[in-house]
């Protein structure tokens, strides 16, 4: 499964195989056919 890269805003997310490297950045996640940034950093690390 492809991993998501960290994004600055909730609406903008880019899909990459890298994990989130900063706590301030939000992780991108797929939600209802759309990519959204998750608020918790721990969730980004899991996927």
UniProtKB/Swiss-Prot annotation:
The keyword Nucleus applies. GO terms for cellular component: nucleosome; nucleus. Testis. Its main location: nucleus. It is found in: Nucleus; Chromosome. One of its GO terms (molecular function) is DNA binding. The keyword Thylakoid does not apply. Keywords: Chromosome, Developmental protein, Differentiation, DNA condensation, DNA-binding, Nucleosome core, Nucleus, Spermatogenesis. One of its GO terms (biological process) is spermatogenesis. Protamines substitute for histones in the chromatin of sperm during the haploid phase of spermatogenesis. They compact sperm DNA into a highly condensed, stable and inactive complex. Belongs to the protamine P1 family. This is Sperm protamine P1. It comes from Myotis daubentonii (Daubenton's bat).
